[in-house]
């Protein structure tokens, strides 16, 4: 979804600035959008030499509450999840130049099947995910990787499976990426210097326990 249908440039800039401030608060290191990051004292899982996650963003600053109420985000989640959704977690992937997830691209599905064989899938709208791009997404810049049609397989990929079919999800800063939880997704390694930032809002059915401990 293009930036003009998501939020104003002013909101985007404020969100980016807020995420960088939280990076500093949690790592003890200064962050510059044009320079590679540092993990510092911060420890979170999953974590690589060129990426970490910021958790519990909803309570970190009022701007994330405003984002949760964004009309475009909510309209798309209502469509995908038939109005049954609740916020499960709000995080930010802080990524910089490096190998990232390696050759597998970290491909996975957010929706796990009800059986190991994947014959009886979970409901189509048990989970859906979204990525608000705070920087440009290109393959060289470490964009998301998705495997078209993989949501029809109703299972997790085997190690290395799907890499040859993965395509980059390229988008301008301010764009919103929305996807069903069943599609295999990960990310390409970032080849360029500087940060790739986002805010990921993950939604689940109200029958499921949320990832973040919301009350």
Spans of model-derived segments:
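Non-heme Fe(II)/2-oxoglutarate
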Residues: 28, 176, 183-184, 188-215
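Non-heme Fe(II)-dependent double-stranded beta-helix
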Residues: 3-115
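Short hydrophobic-aromatic micro-motifs
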Residues: 2, 132, 177-179
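A structural signal for short, well-ordered beta-strand segments
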Residues: 89-92, 130-132, 199-203
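Catalytic core of non-heme Fe(II) oxygenases with the double-stranded beta-helix
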Residues: 75-76, 99-171, 208-214
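Active-site rim elements
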Residues: 61-66, 164-167, 186-188
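A short, structured loop/turn motif at beta-sheet edges
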Residues: 8-10, 172-175, 207
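Extended serine/threonine-enriched, polar tracts that run as long, contiguous segments within proteins
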Residues: 165-185
